Design a protein with these regions (language model features):
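Membrane-embedded alpha-helical bundles that constitute the cytochrome b-like, heme-associated redox core
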Residues: 1-157
Length: 157
């Protein structure tokens, strides 16, 4: 991976963790707004960090996809079982999709008041968390059990 690809990977990872942490504050403000029509909570620092942080995740995800298209990525280990190759590919495709769909649906809910977008946003969150867990578990499995360089390629290798 290029330096830019590695940097964007870790920046987006940190930003997504922050999004998960800030999520409950966003939900609380939104529910208060729905109950009372009081918009003041929708401009709180926690809400604004969640909204604008999400949009940055979207921008960085698009940048990552452009780098991936233009620079490519290292090949998977040649002796990797076909099932693991498929799981890795599918996980990456869905993770990239969620890095686009979650911010887009959140923006549609926040800026456009589209309730269905907010509901979709909520439904995608646990899927993202599970896939992040799978992604991390896969990297650790590659590193400690299969003894490949997959993890090192995204850190210092």
């Amino acid at each position: 991976y290029t330096v830019a690809q590695k940097a964007l990977h870790w920046i987006v990872a940190i930003m997504i963790i922050a999004q998960v942490v800030l999520h409950e504050g966003m939900v609380d403000a939104w529910r208060t707004f729905e109950r009372t029509a009081d918009v003041s909570g929708l401009s709180s620092p926690v809400v604004l960090l969640h909204v604008w942080g999400g949009l940055l995740v979207l921008v960085f995800a698009m940048w990552r996809l452009a780098l991936r298209r233009n620079r490519g990525v290292p090949p998977v280990p040649a002796d990797e079982p076909a099932l693991l190759k498929f799981i890795a590919m599918a996980t990456h495709v869905v993770l990239y999709g969620l890095m686009i769909l979650l911010p887009a649906s959140g923006a549609a809910a926040y800026f456009g008041g589209i309730e269905a977008a907010g509901e979709a946003h909520e439904l995608m969150k646990p899927v993202l968390i599970v896939l992040i867990g799978l992604h991390v578990a896969g990297a650790l499995y590659q590193h400690f059990w299969l003894k490949t360089d997959v993890l090192k390629r995204m850190t210092h290798g």
